[in-house]
Structures are given as structure tokens and as C-alpha cells.
Regions:
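Mg2+-dependent phosphoryl-transfer enzymes with acidic/Ser/Thr/Gly-rich catalytic loops
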Residues: 2-16, 28, 54, 189, ...
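Short amphipathic alpha-helices and their capping/turn segments at secondary-structure boundaries
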Residues: 12-29, 81-87
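Asp-based phosphoryl-transfer active-site loop
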Residues: 26-46, 74, 197
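Residue-level signal for inorganic ion chemistry
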Residues: 39, 94, 147, 197, ...
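Active-site phosphate-binding/coordination module
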Residues: 52-141
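Substrate-recognition/cap helix-loop segment adjacent to the acidic, metal-dependent catalytic center
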Residues: 78-97, 155-175
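Substrate-recognition "cap/lid" segment bordering the active-site pocket of phosphatases
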Residues: 97, 103-124, 178-208
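Charged, glycine-interspersed solvent-exposed loop segments at helix/strand-loop junctions
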Residues: 136-153, 174-187
């Protein structure tokens, strides 16, 4: 796999990524592990509800949570409720809704919310776009709305055109369009995964640790961009993104890497 002491590949037109000496990867007692879910920990599926947690992953996450003294968090566009449904019965610290909500302690029901739910009329207009073609799936995340077209790739241009028209009709609406892997997501502007991670890093047990973030999609690039502020490490999945120290080919490689973090006697060597 590409995460070793050699130079990994680079995105076309981007500068070469820098080799990652094993000695730079911090001990788990000094690390905050931050993980995207879809396309990073778990394989992408035709529909959001089809994702599943492979055997052994929850055990690995639980052990990492213990070894980092609680400094492990999932960072996702999904809501916290949705994250909990996927990993049930386990619950983890998490930044959900692209930074709209955050939970530090799974044993504490307190959830920090940073945005109101999306306007109902705006949501109704956006939801109508799903009727453009069979195969377009609507996912209401509360703080955002996603139009998945993995089953209708031909509808991509029509979806973005319709969203752009709605946005033009409502120029003052505080919304942002997030293009993803066969998904067009619309959310409140003013918060991102990066803003969520920044707040997370001010709170115990994450405060003062070096973050290690792994993500796969365009929305994860905001977090890649802030890792230098914390002397952190960033890795992409499935593509060679800019601003990362290396990449994994697939979620299975990510899961293997996380297992190796536990297997190595130093807790921090790359496989």
C-alpha cells in the first residue's frame, strides 16, 4: 500500500507529496485520530442506507478510542443520529452534518449544534429535483440535503442546473453547494468539516494532540487544509489529493492501517 517511507504518488498538476518518516507519526498517547466515514472507513454503496460496518472495525475503533484516551472522532457529512445507526450499538465522538453538530463524549447525551435546520420551503424546492429522473435519491440530513445520482449518472448536469436556478432565485439564502462522488449536497454556509475539527481540537481530550485525519472526498479538503496549523498529518483515500502526506487506495487499506497502529509496539509505525 502507498503509505510507507517512500514518496507516494501525486495528483495531476499538484506538487509531489513529501515522504513520511516513521518517526514523525506520533505515539497514540499524543495523537487525535479523525476519520471520515463514507469512502474512507466504509466502502461507498449505491445508496447511503446500504453501507455496512465490516467485521472487526468496531473492535479496532474501540481499542483506538481506549489507547488515545478518547481522542478519536468520526468526521462526517452525516448527522450524528445517522452515524449512530450505522455503527450501532457502538457510539463514538463525532463531528456530524459537515460541522453543524458535535459530540465529544458518547456517554454524555449533550450535543453541540451550530446551525438551524434547513428552511422548509427551500428544502421542499430542492427535494423536488429528485423527481427529474428515476434513480435520483434524496437524503435529508437535517442540516443539509443530498441528491445522490449514483444510480442515475446521466442526471448530473440536470441536477446541478436545477440547484443553480434555485440558488439564483434566492441569492441571499445562506447555502453552499458541495459536489461529491455522485452526490450534490446543499448545506448552510458558515460551517464546514474544518470548522468542526477546529472546535474539536480546542476540547479535551483532543486539545494539544497532533491530529491524524483521513478522508476521501472534496468536503474533506477543508480539513486537509488546516492540518498544518496543528502539526497534523492528512491522508486521502482513492485519490492523491493536494495537501496530504500520503494516500490509501481503498477503505480496506485504511482499516488495515488502523489495525497496524494497534499492532505495532510503538503504537505509531506505519505498515
Amino acid at each position: 500500500m502507498p503509505l510507507d517511507d517512500e514518496i507516494v504518488g501525486e495528483e495531476e498538476g499538484a506538487p509531489e507529496t513529501v515522504p513520511v518518516p516513521r518517526s514523525l507519526v506520533p505515539h497514540l498517547s499524543e495523537t487525535a485520530i479523525l476519520l471520515d466515514i463514507d469512502g474512507t472507513l466504509l466502502e461507498l454503496m449505491p445508496t447511503p442506507r446500504e453501507v455496512w460496518v465490516p467485521p472487526g472495525l468496531s473492535k479496532t475503533l474501540n481499542r483506538l478510542l481506549a489507547r488515545t484516551n478518547g481522542a478519536l472522532a468520526l468526521v462526517s457529512g452525516r448527522s450524528l443520529n445517522d452515524i449512530d445507526l450505522i455503527f450501532a450499538p457502538e457510539q463514538y465522538p463525532a463531528v456530524g452534518g459537515h460541522g453543524a453538530e458535535m459530540r465529544i463524549d458518547p456517554d454524555n447525551e449533550s450535543v453541540d449544534s451550530h446551525a438551524p435546520p434547513m428552511d422548509r420551503e427551500l428544502k421542499r424546492r430542492l427535494a423536488a429535483i429528485a423527481k427529474l429522473s428515476p434513480g435520483i435519491l434524496l437524503e435529508d440530513k437535517g442540516y443539509s440535503l443530498a441528491l445522490h445520482y449514483r444510480l442515475a449518472p446521466h442526471a448530473e448536469k440536470a441536477i446541478y442546473a436545477a440547484v443553480s436556478l434555485i440558488r439564483a432565485d434566492l441569492p441571499n439564502a445562506p447555502i453552499e453547494i458541495l459536489p461529491g462522488k455522485c452526490v450534490c449536497e446543499i448545506k448552510h454556509s458558515g460551517f464546514t468539516k474544518a470548522t468542526g475539527v477546529r472546535e474539536l481540537m480546542t476540547r479535551e481530550p483532543f486539545k494539544g494532540r497532533r491530529p491524524l485525519f483521513i478522508g476521501d472526498d472534496v468536503t474533506d479538503e477543508t480539513v486537509f487544509g488546516i492540518m498544518p496549523d496543528y502539526d497534523g498529518l492528512a491522508f486521502s483515500v482513492g485519490r492523491r489529493a493536494q495537501g496530504v502526506q500520503g494516500h490509501f487506495d481503498s477503505p480496506s487499506d485504511v482499516r488495515e492501517f488502523l489495525s497496524h497502529l494497534l499492532d505495532d509496539e510503538r503504537d505509531a509505525a506505519l505498515p
